[in-house]
């Protein structure tokens, strides 16, 4: 693999979800890719386990601005002589205050936007099964009114407060932002134009699809593949698992085998309602999953 003319020291920042998901996989893959290309990678990671009662009571404030994050990231930047900070998820325990550490240390910062959360607290522009753009058009308070974040008005207030506060600080206007698709980029530019005050700097918004490491297992010739389809991802409404299970119910006993790989809140419902043509594997190691995909006819991801 070609090496860079001048390797850099890159700090990757990510707050892991309680249930492993795509953002976690992208974070790990990007870390490996940068290292493979000769860069020195440092990571700053947390999870969303708030700990004891005192920590849970302080979490709403720390989710908005974490002095711990600022202090630790500044120290890490100085100690490791970091050239660039690349942020993935900051919700909840890292907080966007990580960027203040970058600003204070005069280190460039970039964030990959895996969702629309800077305009929509639930991140997906959906409510009650329909497209919803109320927050981009009428303000973040709409999410609080509809309890959009985790079905909780209190948690929605915290989430909306995070982005409202950092709009006031102008945090995202100083950060380079990456979207995963041109559609995402166009929607964010549209929302930014309609905002009473720009949330980010348009010239700092770029599109870079997620990279994927070359699989160890090449796909088998079509004739040699098993009559099966793989559903891989977090088992939740957003990923379309309910639709897939209902489709397999309609297809009947002649349907190809659907192999569901992953865990999530919809798992119990799916197992209860799945026909015999659906099997569940739980969370699979990456190598096992790629081998399974290589011998299957299609994937639902």
Regions flagged by a language model, labelled:
Residues 16-18, 211, 232-242, 264, ...:
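Short donor-sugar binding/catalytic loops of nucleotide-sugar-dependent glycosyltransferases
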Residues 1-47, 78-80, 98-108, 249:
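N-terminal subdomain of nucleotide-sugar transferases
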Residues 294-301:
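Acidic donor-binding loop of glycosyltransferase active sites
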Residues 118, 133, 137-217, 280-281:
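Donor nucleotide-sugar binding/catalytic pocket of nucleotide-sugar-dependent glycosyltransferases
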Residues 67, 264-267, 278-293:
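Conserved active-site histidine-acidic residue motif and adjacent donor-binding/catalytic loop
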Residues 12, 74-94, 108-117:
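Short N-terminal targeting/anchoring amphipathic segment
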Residues 178, 212, 216, 221-239, ...:
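Conserved donor-binding/catalytic core segment of Leloir-type glycosyltransferases
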Residues 47-48, 232-235, 257-270, 274:
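Glycosyltransferase donor-sugar binding loop
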């Amino acid at each position: 693999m070609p090496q860079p003319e001048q390797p850099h020291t890159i700090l990757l920042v990510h707050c892991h979800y309680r249930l492993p998901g795509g953002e976690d996989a992208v974070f790990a893959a990007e870390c490996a890719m940068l290292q493979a290309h000769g860069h020195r990678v440092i990571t700053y990671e947390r999870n969303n386990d708030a700990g004891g009662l005192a920590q849970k009571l302080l979490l709403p404030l720390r989710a908005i601005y974490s002095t711990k994050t600022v202090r630790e990231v500044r120290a890490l930047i100085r100690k490791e002589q970091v050239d660039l900070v690349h942020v993935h998820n900051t919700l909840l325990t890292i907080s966007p205050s990580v960027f203040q550490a970058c600003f204070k240390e005069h280190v460039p910062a970039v964030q990959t936007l895996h969702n629309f959360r800077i305009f929509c607290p639930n991140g997906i522009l959906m409510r009650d099964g329909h497209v919803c753009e109320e927050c981009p058009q009428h303000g973040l308070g709409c999410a609080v009114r509809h309890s959009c974040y985790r079905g909780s008005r209190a948690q929605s207030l915290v989430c909306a407060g995070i982005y409202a506060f950092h709009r006031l600080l102008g945090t995202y206007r100083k950060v380079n932002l990456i979207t995963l698709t041109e559609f995402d980029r166009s929607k964010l530019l549209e929302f930014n134009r309609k905002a009473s005050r720009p949330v980010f700097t348009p010239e700092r918004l770029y599109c870079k699809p997620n990279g994927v490491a070359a699989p160890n297992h090449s796909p088998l010739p079509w004739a040699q593949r098993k009559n099966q389809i793989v559903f891989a991802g977090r088992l939740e409404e957003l990923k379309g698992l309910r639709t897939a299970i209902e489709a397999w119910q309609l297809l009947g006993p002649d349907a190809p085998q659907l192999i569901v790989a992953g865990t999530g809140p919809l798992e119990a419902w799916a197992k209860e309602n799945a026909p015999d043509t659906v099997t569940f594997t739980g969370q699979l190691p990456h190598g096992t999953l790629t081998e399974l995909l290589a011998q299957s006819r299609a994937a639902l991801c």
